[in-house]
């Protein structure tokens, strides 16, 4: 490839001034990357690729369609008063373990450097949130930073936290997937308060890669409450037997609203364990793809019938294989359970399943894609 062109889509007539041409050097071609920085935000473009001295039908190779995003404005999104920009600081992997979290101002925003790994809650350290806090990586073409969890974030006793934000971060357990011995995986969570009384209004995950947790958010105590948990454009892989979000059995705590939008989710034991009637109001799953979910013989949902479950524009592959209690990642299992009770009245909209996906209990109401899991996810 020696050049590419970008043309705004939707034009009735394309003039020469509408066509942007970018030469591709041999170094850029070998790296597989060409940086373009003069396109209009929130605009769809048709990008065509050429090999040759001119851009013509003879040198045309391929094309794709892309949509640009709004340039991020940290000042507008998070304000300026309580921002800590770690891009300007000497890197310390234990930085967050050394902070006095009680002294942080409400709504403190940590701006993270690309490509760095921070170790969290290691040794005797336990980070407890007392205020709203935001962890944000600005738009970047570099690798996202990583949070490596030895243990979960917690909330101070009696704490009221309005919002916790994770944006463009790799969230991983410090224990590697190769060390997993059973379906609890790392045995850890991202957020798991131990306090008897707490309230978190919103937990927001945006464009994060999340891997190897027993659960991502778990509310354990009968008087602990989480208002809303949102996953947007996240990739979630390898979540254990507590499910992506969960409360502790039939205790009276609740996780009120859970949403997934434009996510890719693989190798999970289950989505939600919210079995108490006061556990919540709704679960919304839209524009999301699942494969190797749930774990073989495990449940995708364990929710009280009073909780509304919305599934729209989603695709589901087959279950994840298990050997005894050991998950076999990316291997197709014999089938799982859509619903632990078998009686939840699911009503999916424009959502499909692989023809080798089976449920021994419950029915999501998915349409048959007439394709196997292998065909769907390798096409």
Predicted segments, located by residue:
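Beta-strand-rich modules
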Residues: 36-55
């Amino acid at each position: 490839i020696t050049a590419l062109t970008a043309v705004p889509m939707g034009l009735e007539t394309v003039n020469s001034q509408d066509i942007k041409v970018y030469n591709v050097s041999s170094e850029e071609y070998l790296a597989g990357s060409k940086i373009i920085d003069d396109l209009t935000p929130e605009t769809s473009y048709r990008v065509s690729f050429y090999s040759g001295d001119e851009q013509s039908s003879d040198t045309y190779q391929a094309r794709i369609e892309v949509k640009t995003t709004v340039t991020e404005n940290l000042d507008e999104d998070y304000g300026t008063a309580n921002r800590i920009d770690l891009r300007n600081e000497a890197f310390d992997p234990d930085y967050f373990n050394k902070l006095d979290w009680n002294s942080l101002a409400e709504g403190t925003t940590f701006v993270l450097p690309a490509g760095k790994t921070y170790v969290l809650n290691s040794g005797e350290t336990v980070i407890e949130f007392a205020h709203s806090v935001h962890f944000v990586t600005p738009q970047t073409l570099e690798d996202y930073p990583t949070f490596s969890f030895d243990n979960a974030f917690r909330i101070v006793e009696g704490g009221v936290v309005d919002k916790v934000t994770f944006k463009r971060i790799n969230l991983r357990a410090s224990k590697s997937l190769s060390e997993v011995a059973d379906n609890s995986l790392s045995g850890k969570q991202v957020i798991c308060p131990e306090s008897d009384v707490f309230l978190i209004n919103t937990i927001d995950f945006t464009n994060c890669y999340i891997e190897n947790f027993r659960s991502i958010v778990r509310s354990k105590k009968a008087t602990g409450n989480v208002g809303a948990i949102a996953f947007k454009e996240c990739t979630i892989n390898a979540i254990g037997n507590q499910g992506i979000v969960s409360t502790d059995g039939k205790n009276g705590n609740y996780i009120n609203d859970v949403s997934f939008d434009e996510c890719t989710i693989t190798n999970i034991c289950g989505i939600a364990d919210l079995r108490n009637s006061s556990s919540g109001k709704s679960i919304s799953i839209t524009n999301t793809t699942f494969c190797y979910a749930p774990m073989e013989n495990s449940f995708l949902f364990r929710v009280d019938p009073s909780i509304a479950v919305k599934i729209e524009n989603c695709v589901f592959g087959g279950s994840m294989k298990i050997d005894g209690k050991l998950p076999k990642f990316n291997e197709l299992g014999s089938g799982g359970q859509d619903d632990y009770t078998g009686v939840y009245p699911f009503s999916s909209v424009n959502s499909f399943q692989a023809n080798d996906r089976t449920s021994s209990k419950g029915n999501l109401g998915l349409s048959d894609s007439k394709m196997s899991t292998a065909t769907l996810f390798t096409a």
